[in-house]
Amino acid sequence: MLARAERPRPGPRPPPVFPFPPPLSLLLLLAILSAPVCGRVPRSVPRTSLPISEADSYLTRFAASHTYNYSALLVDPASHTLYVGARDSIFALTLPFSGERPRRIDWMVPETHRQNCRKKGKKEDECHNFIQILAIVNASHLLTCGTFAFDPKCGVIDVSSFQQVERLESGRGKCPFEPAQRSAAVMAGGVLYTATVKNFLGTEPIISRAVGRAEDWIRTETLSSWLNAPAFVAAMVLSPAEWGDEDGDDEIFFFFTETSRVLDSYERIKVPRVARVCAGDLGGRKTLQQRWTTFLKADLLCPGPEHGRASGVLQAMAELRPQPGAGTPIFYGIFSSQWEGAAISAVCAFRPQDIRAVLNGPFRELKHDCNRGLPVMDNEVPQPRPGECIANNMKLQQFGSSLSLPDRVLTFIRDHPLMDRPVFPADGRPLLVTTDTAYLRVVAHRVTSLSGKEYDVLYLGTEDGHLHRAVRIGAQLSVLEDLALFPEPQPVESMKLYHDWLLVGSHTEVTQVNTSNCGRLQSCSECILAQDPVCAWSFRLDACVAHAGEHRGMVQDIESADVSSLCPKEPGEHPVVFEVPVATVGHVVLPCSPSSAWASCVWHQPSGVTALTPRRDGLEVVVTPGAMGAYACECQEGGAARVVAAYSLVWGSQRGPSNRAHTVVGAGLVGFLLGVLAASLTLLLIGRRQQRRRQRELLARDKVGLDLGAPPSGTTSYSQDPPSPSPEDERLPLALGKRGSGFGGFPPPFLLDSCPSPAHIRLTGAPLATCDETSI
């Protein structure tokens, strides 16, 4: 079902008055969640955030009833089609989403297979066919593979009819057995290259070229030095033309995390790595038969924020391919810490030429007596160099294919697949490090700005279903926007780009996001401050638009966002001045909520006021007679400043503080006297009732001859005196006092809820969020 939500209309603003009478002796504590107002926030913090209520108008959703796990996405630009692999189903949707009914293939698991799956100890929800691979074979057919209730199957689909999966065959070694197993696959030259596990238990990892019969595949050796409990992330192909080497071979790169065999501590250390094989590899004639002779791997280093320590888990890797002739691709990876409780995400960029340089460097040899790796000396490396693709220079040496390589070369590469040096990120450090967001997926594309300069824009999917849009400026990523994607938090499982649209797959749906939605930026300053390479302010249209390379009458500033020099001075919007009545000495927090987390804010207050404490949520003021007056929060970004919030601090009912204090004291004395009088009358009535009951008992004793002067045996005497008040009751004279069925003197409509602690009174119906009586 396709659905497009309408843009929500803003409701009426609340009146700028307090809808309740000022309290007599309560401290008014203002507290809201807002952007920081003191200090400079890092660019890893999103500049703006759109909750689901605002973001929903920019999203288009697709979901089929009773269908889940929309995790496999494939975009076919030629046919403008998005293929979606879900649980037991495959869909074909026209791009961009337009409401057209999608085509669907149901690829169900027979009940006999499901019974066998359950007999193997698997849960009912696991015994389905989770689609894991979708790949374009040619213009007429797709290849697809699914888990098929822990018995992987593969088949082809005729895209013109799109009715069923045909020519089924075993998918073992191509597709994982369950969706929780990380895998990767890529099609190169009509051939499928995969990285997955080969057995039911998931203990035999394999990187293979799946052509023909399984026994004829070229695959990795079953040695822990080759692959040691890997979690595969991505697979990518680079052609020789992208290297500028027309005589070379296609190279397939696999990105994964595996357990290190080098024991630097008592814990199992996870290491992110990249491996490479050559498309023309035929294996060895005797040694490494049906095995890769070009398999090399190296560490990927993405230093963490603490002591330069590398992040140990690779979560995702995206490839950004420039236009033909505009340079080599670049890889963007998301890294996280392997240690529980360390919520660290880092984004690093890697250049293919840096990876190739490491693969051409020294090998590492693992010394079994010390469990540490040492570099192999150059004079110990045989010739021709092990692990190289067969190129023209090797053919000149009579090595026409890998089948003609000598055994000493094959033996060396079998025993030394790991390189000694790591691959460092471009610029030597991460582009982005955050300690409060868990990134799971990434895609990237290159956008040309109004000036003609190109910028890389990254889309980062989070663990709780948010989308962060970031632009790379120099050696830093600046997170421009946080977009909530789903009504309920859920991980982002897959992402694909199609022109100006981003397709996001999750457990419950596929979401289409417009990546060039400039129209929501309503003013010149908002358009410039957004720093979006796609958007520019048009003076002719008086709107923020996607510039599409047009320069006339448009302005944009990606790196400086200098509003003051590009935009005309906009009429200032003065916020409503909220009057804040206070009645006793205490602390008041005045909120300041700028629209941008990157804005720097200052407070203007009455002269002579010094008892002020800037906070992340506003300004804390110590209430004194000298603190009364006007307060304003002014925020600046891009050279433009405006007042965000304004307050007037006054004594409760516009009377002087001394008269107010006298009134409070007088009211307190009157209340105390009335309380004493009421207590005396109550005790008198209780005494009279007890006396009358005693007289009736004495008369009854005279009649039956019983002595009620002492308690009967087996009972305990007790006193009828009222219990003394508890210390908690004595702390809360205001909370216990009621007037007009209200609480603490406030009428019932402004009571929010019962307080978890009787020392806190919560109010509603006004910008005063919290009253804390314990601060009085």
From Swiss-Prot:
<dbReference type="GO" id="GO:0043204">
    <property type="term" value="C:perikaryon"/>
</dbReference>
<feature type="disulfide bond">
    <location>
        <begin position="518"/>
        <end position="535"/>
    </location>
</feature>
<dbReference type="GO" id="GO:0005886">
    <property type="term" value="C:plasma membrane"/>
</dbReference>
<keyword id="KW-0393">Immunoglobulin domain</keyword>
<dbReference type="GO" id="GO:0045211">
    <property type="term" value="C:postsynaptic membrane"/>
</dbReference>
<feature type="disulfide bond">
    <location>
        <begin position="592"/>
        <end position="633"/>
    </location>
</feature>
<dbReference type="GO" id="GO:0031290">
    <property type="term" value="P:retinal ganglion cell axon guidance"/>
</dbReference>
<feature type="transmembrane region" description="Helical">
    <location>
        <begin position="666"/>
        <end position="686"/>
    </location>
</feature>
<comment type="subunit">
    <text>Interacts (via PDZ-binding motif) with DLG4/SAP90 (via PDZ domain 2); this interaction may promote translocation of DLG4/SAP90 to the membrane.</text>
</comment>
<keyword id="KW-1003">Cell membrane</keyword>
<feature type="modified residue" description="Phosphoserine">
    <location>
        <position position="724"/>
    </location>
</feature>
<keyword id="KW-0472">Membrane</keyword>
<dbReference type="Pfam" id="PF01437">
    <property type="entry name" value="PSI"/>
</dbReference>
<feature type="signal peptide">
    <location>
        <begin position="1"/>
        <end position="39"/>
    </location>
</feature>
<dbReference type="Pfam" id="PF19428">
    <property type="entry name" value="Sema4F_C"/>
</dbReference>
<keyword id="KW-0812">Transmembrane</keyword>
<keyword id="KW-1133">Transmembrane helix</keyword>
<dbReference type="GO" id="GO:0016020">
    <property type="term" value="C:membrane"/>
</dbReference>
<dbReference type="InterPro" id="IPR036352">
    <property type="entry name" value="Semap_dom_sf"/>
</dbReference>
<dbReference type="InterPro" id="IPR015943">
    <property type="entry name" value="WD40/YVTN_repeat-like_dom_sf"/>
</dbReference>
<keyword id="KW-0524">Neurogenesis</keyword>
<feature type="domain" description="Sema">
    <location>
        <begin position="47"/>
        <end position="515"/>
    </location>
</feature>
<keyword id="KW-0597">Phosphoprotein</keyword>
<dbReference type="InterPro" id="IPR027231">
    <property type="entry name" value="Semaphorin"/>
</dbReference>
<dbReference type="GO" id="GO:0045499">
    <property type="term" value="F:chemorepellent activity"/>
</dbReference>
<dbReference type="GO" id="GO:0005783">
    <property type="term" value="C:endoplasmic reticulum"/>
</dbReference>
<feature type="modified residue" description="Phosphoserine">
    <location>
        <position position="726"/>
    </location>
</feature>
<dbReference type="GO" id="GO:0045202">
    <property type="term" value="C:synapse"/>
</dbReference>
<feature type="disulfide bond">
    <location>
        <begin position="302"/>
        <end position="348"/>
    </location>
</feature>
<feature type="topological domain" description="Cytoplasmic">
    <location>
        <begin position="687"/>
        <end position="776"/>
    </location>
</feature>
<feature type="disulfide bond">
    <location>
        <begin position="117"/>
        <end position="127"/>
    </location>
</feature>
<dbReference type="InterPro" id="IPR016201">
    <property type="entry name" value="PSI"/>
</dbReference>
<keyword id="KW-0325">Glycoprotein</keyword>
<comment type="function">
    <text>Probable cell surface receptor that regulates oligodendroglial precursor cell migration. Might also regulate differentiation of oligodendroglial precursor cells. Has growth cone collapse activity against retinal ganglion-cell axons.</text>
</comment>
<feature type="glycosylation site" description="N-linked (GlcNAc...) asparagine">
    <location>
        <position position="514"/>
    </location>
</feature>
<dbReference type="GO" id="GO:0098839">
    <property type="term" value="C:postsynaptic density membrane"/>
</dbReference>
<feature type="disulfide bond">
    <location>
        <begin position="145"/>
        <end position="154"/>
    </location>
</feature>
<keyword id="KW-0770">Synapse</keyword>
<dbReference type="GO" id="GO:0071526">
    <property type="term" value="P:semaphorin-plexin signaling pathway"/>
</dbReference>
<feature type="short sequence motif" description="PDZ-binding">
    <location>
        <begin position="774"/>
        <end position="776"/>
    </location>
</feature>
<keyword id="KW-0217">Developmental protein</keyword>
<keyword id="KW-0732">Signal</keyword>
